Amino acid sequence: MTAVTLFAIAFLSGLVTVHPAPQVANRTFEPVVIYDEALSVNALERLVKVGGRRYLIVYQDDCDKAAKSTGTIDIPALARHVAERPSGFPSDWAVLDYEIPFDDWIREGPGSAHWKTATDSMVAAIERMKSLFPGVKWTYYGVPRLEFYIDGKTWASATDAAKKAEIERQFQRYAPIIAKCDWLAPSVYMVVGDRSDGGRPGDLQQRETRAWTRAVIESAVDFGRRVGNPVPVVPFVSPVYQPGGGARNQAFIPSAVIDECTIRPIVEAGGSGVCIWTAGSYIVSQVTAPPPVGKAPDADITPVLRQWSEDLRVPESTLRSPDGITDLRRRFADATAGFAEKFMTVWAARRGATVPAPPLSGQPAPPRPSEPAKTAPP
């Protein structure tokens, strides 16, 4: 029986109380704004001005394609990939993104052989990363989770009993991993909207999204406290819609919707910041490149290009031109910077002065990684 299994058994033996979110007055962490890419000097200047920093994200396909079939992380391959990065670390925040089949296996819960395999591997991998790179704060993407739909109902319309049961299920599934993370990065991407209206959600959808976002952050804050690891909760967010709901994939989210459905509930629920992800450079490369000969255009990307063409009243060919590519990059850059600026504005209004974050281990903070970033800013 492994330490992870013993840990899980201990938490399964009656911990069912859901504690309230921390009060604003008890806030101890500085606000955190981290992002995947800036895409323009102007956006970079704006991000730096609000304290933004890039984070490192390691996707499983970067170094461990076999993990999709084994459900285990090749830790030596992961360590080599991170250690041999020519550009070093962009900051002291890092994310491991292992989703397939890890999400499904963890969803099976304690008692499942798949759950044990995936959980043991994820715990061992993050422990290894923390020992090799002690100046970096490590986490996993999407941990912990909370389902938007419960038994066919949205979070907002589900019963209190159903919500409580869902929260406890997720705690049981993720407790061993949460105990090892230096910060928690649940995903609160917006996926719900109306394709016929360019992805913009209606009033009801906005209220439902807001309620779910707040619950995700509150539960993550609570889970960290329950495992004795009250680390910052810095959720993954995006200025564009993500797949999984009715919204048009990769369409830009209106600023007012971001404010109401994402930023404010994060701050109000006790979140410590935002981890902004767009993959903008990849998306721009997809929507601006002609499809390969004999291959149909991407089913999700092409409608976004068409929508932009209609909104800007320019031909698709213009968007694919050098000037069009530059303009699309600027739009993603501005969306990232705007998200960061809005978050800091809401934080300042809600939280007031901040108190510096304590070292994660209770000891003097370790030095930053020795590998300085060598790449020029975008």
Predicted regions and their residues:
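Substrate-binding cleft of secreted/luminal carbohydrate-active enzymes
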Residues: 234-360
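Aromatic- and acid-rich polysaccharide-binding/catalytic face
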Residues: 98-103, 160, 166-210, 277-279
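Active-site clefts of carbohydrate-active enzymes
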Residues: 142-152, 220-256
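Active-site groove signature of glycoside hydrolases
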Residues: 84-115, 144, 180-192, 272-279
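Structural preference for beta-strand elements that scaffold enzyme active sites
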Residues: 29-33, 54-58, 91-95, 135-139, ...
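Substrate-binding cleft/loops of secretory-pathway carbohydrate-active enzymes
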Residues: 144-185, 245-246, 250-254
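Alpha-helical scaffolding within the catalytic cores
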Residues: 40-45, 77-83, 162-175, 213-224, ...
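Boundary/entry segment of secreted carbohydrate-active catalytic domains
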Residues: 16-70
